[in-house]
């Protein structure tokens, strides 16, 4: 679907467009499915995809009915695959409420004979499941019934009472019942007995290790590695990685296949090939297996007394739909295994350490798909391993996406800077006449500038006459917008789109002025698509009616032949930024030719100045380092100690005077020399290592205590030219904790004396047995987390104790959960982990950051019986020292210098303007001229005062001093209105001043400049929120209250009423301090409200039908005279 939208973009608009696209695509999926069901064997795939792609508005009611029926069909299917059987239970009674037709035969019969009574229980509606399995199996199932997160227990190994056959019971909960899939354990399998996450890691350990060892920066390498590892792990004939594009169509981006199979790498297919409903199911059930697409499905029989239909969406056995089976058969794929790749939604905000904030929203990035030309069954443990591997893969995909965005943003910013530099020399023609040009800003095939009725063309663009038609069409049909973007000019309604289709079909355009426009163009998507599919033999011919990859590719090209690659939000943000730069450049050109080149050069070449301020910061840093309660030392580029604070002198017994001048390597233990040498060399190259452990020698009376163990962060010290001149080491003393861990290592068996010791030196320790159940939780963990020992013991450590949902200690996100699982599983296999960053939310919602070390636990025979986990917490002093280190970064200083420089440069021309106004005041002016000069003077005073606001925190916290003077409301109103008249005239908005004359002329006492600043801000925001041609009304009321004999307190209330839908909710939330200050409007509103608070006032915002109002209140004093 084409999207025509203003050239601004936001998270909310992105999400709403995404939702609208999904709804529309689901409607198309439903129609296509209905056509397939009606047509049967005569179904024509290619024509159906083309027809369903165009949704007629008149058919919408019918589409809704079709969609509802389709979704109900998807969710309420009543068939399963025959490789296993299914039971649905009433949780309260353990009785069967639904079963698959093959369940009695698989679970209760020794042979195909009719079941007998006694030892061979019959299975049907109302059967108690505990009578079907052996006592231990029945007990395990009984325990699962009361388990909150029942899926954490999967798979449960059970044995039939009748035959003794082993099955994996895979359980999930749906509304009203518990559904259990039973998959037979094959004779060649070693039955899985531990929790799925622990055992499955062993199967996928090699693949996970290889993924984690890959260098970042290449999505192609990551995907190629993933399909290679899955190919080796599962043994399928073909493994592919699918990626879903923004318009939901798919692409095969990586593939590995056995010789002789047709390659699908590079294949694109329409969005309808994988319907939205199927994608939703992949988000819920992340691994899906089809054993044999030709197998006959088995019906599920349900108790007729149940008041609802069971849904099998979460079942591992759920039967695929006939449409999908036919597609598989047509491409000679008999069996498949599909893994969902779920990543963070880029439209969402980042993670927060606040416990009350929701988790990041997820989206289906793509799929890892395995195909086989013969039936293939993959046991559940291996499928679980694949799911775990897919989660690790998704984490790395997420990182690659973030890295790609960072690189793109960096390139865009670099291009914007260069374009801005060109504008300083030649605005606006520099963006098309020099290099780089506007085509380098975003990916496009052509661009054009329409300026002062002349055209400049770059790359593939429409002709000049066609461009003039587009500009005329925009002026007629998009008058209210500052621009638009579309991936299809035809869908956007441009009459001449058909004549352009061979050249371009997507366009982004923004206005510099009402008549000047910048264009970017894209050709149709099909022009960029190449698929190196297998060549046809002479005489072969495709049957486009069949559902097949070749038909999909052909159908995709048909769908996108008049559509370009969509414009991404970050691309539109870059375009909009350039638009603002061009607008400002245009205004500057029309008003005055300032020497902007000199200013820009000065800004770009700006170095850190103001040595006094730098020296003050340095002195404060030195004082903090010397008095810090954590050990801190520093060395120069040669490794010679030039900093040695009181704490490290106390720990080592080496005074400051003796330490200074010694080489660092002579002060550390021999076993730590290589570690320190590597850390020092990396830091001198600018690579600052964190959480490195080494041991340092002791001296004097401290020698008998042995060496000091430190956890150290390196921080490179740099001069003004960014050259590394030394290294500072901020450390934490962990000698006591290391002593405990060493003692633990030496003790074999009797660990409880340490683990359960209440001594404060004992670090937080917890553990798990070999099956994944929490078996240790010491006093330090109770204090740290707020969870008692009895509340966590015998719960699943992964999922119940530490998890992302409904767990005791909530982890920040899915990535943290997966990484924690990897660390635990590595230790279970003998690979111990030391000091990895770890974090979780305590019972009270506080986020705890620490270092995690994991060691295996062994019995007398040397067998691994579980793992121990040790936490090391950073001391408050260390956290403070690191915080100070971050605050002293040179980036912050540079920004401060840039801001100081710009404010200084503004003051000089402002002083000239003030001087000119003063000169005018001394001349013989008429009354109206004097009024205009006075208004200008008030605006200049307001600007000067704002430039003095160097401490916004002071305003926000209420520490600003007000300048009190006599004034009239009339003066404030005139000055405030003058600041918004240009904007109101541009939009054709009438400003009605309904303030009564006696109120306007009342002499008041207060800070008039701050009042006019606030009033101008609220007027501007009201005008921006008012539709073109609307009206803004300002009114006032005034009440007096006598304080003593001579002073009157004035309560002034100003109302600004405007039409339209109102100020955006996000800006209002920022005004009241409910959200992080992000937008310019939000910051302005927030500061204005704080200024009102300083004047003992506040602001309210009222919404009514068709209009909204700001109500501003302030307290002032009244004088005794009226000004005429």
Curated annotation (Swiss-Prot):
Keyword Cell inner membrane recorded: no
Biased composition (Low complexity): 1-19
Keyword Protease listed: no
Sorted UniProt keywords: Chromophore, Photoreceptor protein, Receptor, Repeat, Sensory transduction, Transcription, Transcription regulation
Span of domain Histidine kinase: 901-1120
Signal sequence extent: none
Alphabetized InterPro entries for the sequence: GAF, GAF-like_dom_sf, HATPase_C_sf, His_kinase_dom, HisK_dim/P_dom, PAS, PAS-like_dom_sf, PAS_2
Domain spans labelled GAF: 218-401
Lineage top rank: taxon: Eukaryota
Ranges where the PAS domain occurs: 617-687, 750-821
GO BP annotations listed: detection of visible light; red, far-red light phototransduction; regulation of DNA-templated transcription
Subunit structure: Homodimer.
Purpose of the protein: Regulatory photoreceptor which exists in two forms that are reversibly interconvertible by light: the Pr form that absorbs maximally in the red region of the spectrum and the Pfr form that absorbs maximally in the far-red region. Photoconversion of Pr to Pfr induces an array of morphogenic responses, whereas reconversion of Pfr to Pr cancels the induction of those responses. Pfr controls the expression of a number of nuclear genes including those encoding the small subunit of ribulose-bisphosphate carboxylase, chlorophyll A/B binding protein, protochlorophyllide reductase, rRNA, etc.
Similarity section: Belongs to the phytochrome family.
Protein name per its UniProtKB record: Phytochrome A
Species, as recorded: Pisum sativum
